[in-house]
Amino acid sequence: MLTIKQIRDDKEAAARKLAKKGVDAAPVIEKIISFDDRRKALQLELDNTLAAQNKAAKEIGALMGQGRREEAEERKRFVADLKEKSSRLEAELTDARQELQSAIVSLPNFPAEIVPEGKTAEDNLVVKLVESYTALPENPLPHWELARKYDIIDFDLGVKLTGAGFPVYKGKGARLQRALINYFLDCNTRAGYLEVEPPVMVNEASGFGTGQLPDKEGQMYHATADNFYLVPTAEVPVTNIYRDVILEKEDFPVKMTAYTPCFRREAGSYGKDVRGLNRLHQFDKVEIVQLSLPEKSYEALDGMVAHVESIVKALGLPYRILRLCGGDMSFTSALTYDFEVYSEAQKRWLEVSSVSNFESFQANRLKLRYRDEEKKIQLAHTLNGSSLALPRIVAALLENYQTPEGIRIPEALIPYTGFDIIK
């Protein structure tokens, strides 16, 4: 959530920044300033009314002590009128704050200066390309055919048990999943991230804190009886560990990693791009989260990008890194880098990680703050990234490591799988 100061300091600049995300924010900004002016005026009137009420209440006792009962009764009536007025003002102030809050939360985060202009994924900037292609057999198979051939992932059984987008991993397919999760977590903990195991259901406050609510409720599975949401990413529960927390400057950086199954409705997804593991309703993902001092957050982002790259590189997959354009960025992000691995069998790039700096946007919603050197309370910065998302990594491994003998396992994973080939 943007702060009032960010909007009021230069409303024209705020509108220009949000236009980069494809948002015509000028009308909303004018409403926000108007709502804020009303809130300030009501707050001032309420403060003055309460001050007059307190002063008059004190005068009643003095008048009674002097035997001036008639004047004291008059002051009592005056205080009663002020109490009625203050109650009315408090109700109006509550409404004004809610109007202001609703308007502010409708605006996305400002994009960073280096975010490219653009509206769609076609406008994203390729900042690195590593073409470590493996030699594939003639007419390589896509992963969904390999999964059927080696009986390691059963998509039809998932449909029987739940529905489309809920595959069942079997035998070496299940062991490969478990191996990847453990490998990713080990890579992250070796890099200084604290492993946590959070709940996979969160409340509304947690969804609001990281920006999934009210923006993405249509994409989340909602347990209406308890008003809980299944997590679309471990970012939500892990970042919310520090909701309503004030840290000391020396506590930074805070680095956490977690594995969770993730749940996304993906409403409206259809066509060839959703075949097999390309787009699922339930999938496994390992996440990294950092809390940073504002002046250190872009340095932290660079470190997270380098860390994710080291994992992708160790798997020996062809990959590229993209800097997302304004129109393709998330509601909450200030700057995002996507990692994609190449599928030779599908002839397309598959996203396997998204690493983002949210600056103070999430922290403002979370009330995640710290004390600076002068003991003033400031907003922290939050960052997170997939390290990594499993479905498309599994798809890329199956497709890029297929041979006439079977599917080879990258050397880095063999200690985790206990086997070097699927056949």
Named regions from a protein language model:
Residues 1-134, 148, 152, 156:
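N-terminal alpha-helical targeting/anchoring segments
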